[in-house]
Amino acid sequence: MEELDRSRAFARDVKRIVVKVGTAVVTGKGGRLALGRLGALCEQLAELNSDGFEVILVSSGAVGLGRQRLRYRQLVNSSFADLQKPQTELDGKACAGVGQSSLMAYYETMFDQLDVTAAQLLVNDSSFRDKDFRKQLNETVKSMLDLRVIPIFNENDAISTRRAPYQDSSGIFWDNDSLAALLALELKADLLILLSDVEGLYTGPPSDPNSKLIHTFVKEKHQDEITFGDKSRLGRGGMTAKVKAAVNAAYAGIPVIITSGYSAENIDKVLRGLRVGTLFHQDARLWAPITDSNARDMAVAARESSRKLQALSSEDRKKILLDIADALEANVTTIKAENELDVASAQEAGLEESMVARLVMTPGKISSLAASVRKLADMEDPIGRVLKKTEVADGLVLEKTSSPLGVLLIVFESRPDALVQIASLAIRSGNGLLLKGGKEARRSNAILHKVITDAIPETVGGKLIGLVTSREEIPDLLKLDDVIDLVIPRGSNKLVTQIKNTTKIPVLGHADGICHVYVDKACDTDMAKRIVSDAKLDYPAACNAMETLLVHKDLEQNAVLNELIFALQSNGVTLYGGPRASKILNIPEARSFNHEYCAKACTVEVVEDVYGAIDHIHRHGSAHTDCIVTEDHEVAELFLRQVDSAAVFHNASTRFSDGFRFGLGAEVGVSTGRIHARGPVGVEGLLTTRWIMRGKGQVVDGDNGIVYTHQDIPIQA
């Protein structure tokens, strides 16, 4: 669902384009040509050529292709004894000479099939020092472009006088980013496109889920914020080289976009002015606002505020809604004034009467909205209701309770009253909310959002409800499947279809099992050892097995921590520690807290208290099953109430998180997702369920010695 980006509008008017294809795009995993990607690239360039664009291609790949051919020839001509000898590295210049003809032969074959003529031009950096060379280069390229020929440039590595090595420790290809930037400047290109193996420039390694894609690079803002990861598996410089080349070209007046060469349509999207990849532009620092992080920050803030909302009492949540209703009526004049500006703009723009009618916010409609909010406030609190209570076994009680979904993203069209309805439903159901209304109601939505968020107490925060003001932010939000739980598009079928096709987030319209056991300072030691051992050892590969053991810091002093560790290690469990536990226990540090071992191994970490455990689970858990072992009832209830997982247990092994053991019959799977509602969605449709289990130290132990009763317990009103 890419949208036109105003800062990219210039791309629709370019004529001369330099496209550089990186080695990681040219080749596949085995070092061979990626025929599918290159074929798609040639088709895009041929289409641009026929549409009147002047296309110049800079392609890497010769060294690698030559190395592959020479190695094959060596293998064919080697005896068995030769193969046992250490293999020497092939000379990069020889590889370049052999591979260049193969690379060009492929391009000629592909372009011939597309009825396009291509030409090869090999250059060296020293040549550009010659003024006559640069003049002749421009004349030759101009003649080719006038004849609709696509020039294909590469550095002439075979006779290059560079002293730098022609290979690195991780790959086989050379890099042409600086050559592409140089050619773009020398040939007066309107745009340089650098095709990479990632979507663009990220704030950190692209594999890191916390890394954010930078849409517009601002040197003053981003230069010190970026952490580069490993360079390309094949190329010489990777993203570092691309950024340096892009900055040099952009500050000299040539706009640059780094984007993925893996998508067959990205060049076309760039030229349509869509927001793909990372833009480098000499005027970028003058554009405001720079909103690269707004989408994620807004979603994370909504989630944090929703947890604060859920922690309030039922009466306090009710009061928020009543205050909102009062605020709506108190601000009728202001709301009406802003709404009239929207209506006037819509009429001036020639919108259909039916759409204009939906825009209108009369005093009567505002009063009606306030009344509906009060009615919602008077409803029974939907959060934390016990829906079912079961005695699983003697002394082991299971409750099914209602719980908020989390963070909702609602995309709706030109009905400002929908904002009030959706916001009040979200607050009643304890959810964080992000809203994107139609541009026709921009002023109305803004004032309604302000009135509502001003009525939310500081203990929760106005960021509970975020208002998305630009369509350009929607694609970013749709990528945030780690912080947004449900998308509800309210609009045309096209809108719903577009969103469904461009997001991993569940869409309501027309996993990992990283389970935690937290052992509190008030635990029964023997019970803790039984539960921890059972949670890890009863079936280590199960998704409900313990993967992380969290221990209260006080247990280090009274030797309980050592007893828990011994119980695991004596049964063959390999332990890895967090930063704190690895030093205390002298065990290897875990690579990540977000790791599911599915084996006789787990992570151990020491936390300050129950709040530290809850925070750790929220940051590193998968919302599957988490358990607390404690004799402190208040601490247990705090944990059960605040841990936002599908199943939360007190004094019971995580292995009980199973359809059969819950008395549900056969199990299809364990879902950590939250989508479930069908039909008209009110408060109930914005809720999910959680399982709360209270036990007395029971363990599964292969179901030996436990009698399942599965008796329904009456729910007290």
Swiss-Prot record:
InterPro entries: AceGlu_kinase-like_sf, Ald_DH/histidinol_DH, Ald_DH_C, Ald_DH_N, Aldehyde_DH_dom, Asp/Glu/Uridylate_kinase, G-glutamylP_reductase_CS, Glu/AcGlu_kinase
Pathway stated in the Swiss-Prot or TrEMBL entry: Amino-acid biosynthesis; L-proline biosynthesis; L-glutamate 5-semialdehyde from L-glutamate: step 1/2; Amino-acid biosynthesis; L-proline biosynthesis; L-glutamate 5-semialdehyde from L-glutamate: step 2/2
GO molecular-function terms, A-Z: ATP binding; delta1-pyrroline-5-carboxylate synthetase activity; glutamate 5-kinase activity; glutamate-5-semialdehyde dehydrogenase activity
Binding residues for ATP: 196-197, 236-242
Coiled coil: none
Catalytic activity, as annotated: L-glutamate + ATP = L-glutamyl 5-phosphate + ADP; L-glutamate 5-semialdehyde + phosphate + NADP(+) = L-glutamyl 5-phosphate + NADPH + H(+)
CDD domains in the cross-refs: ALDH_F18-19_ProA-GPR (cd07079)
Region described as Glutamate 5-kinase: 1-296
EC annotation from Swiss-Prot or TrEMBL: 2.7.2.11, 1.2.1.41
Region feature Gamma-glutamyl phosphate reductase, mapped onto this chain: 297-717
GO biological process assignments: hyperosmotic salinity response; L-proline biosynthetic process; pollen development; proline biosynthetic process; response to oxidative stress; response to salt stress; response to water deprivation; root development
GO cellular component: chloroplast; cytoplasm; Golgi apparatus
Top-rank taxon: Eukaryota
Keywords tagged on the record: Amino-acid biosynthesis, ATP-binding, Kinase, Multifunctional enzyme, NADP, Nucleotide-binding, Oxidoreductase, Proline biosynthesis, Transferase
Binding site for substrate: 60, 157, 176
Family: In the N-terminal section; belongs to the glutamate 5-kinase family. In the C-terminal section; belongs to the gamma-glutamyl phosphate reductase family.
Function: P5CS plays a key role in proline biosynthesis, leading to osmoregulation in plants.
HAMAP family according to UniProt: ProA, ProB
NCBIfam families per the UniProt record, alphabetical: P5CS, PRK00197.1, proA, proB
Protein name in UniProt: Delta-1-pyrroline-5-carboxylate synthase A
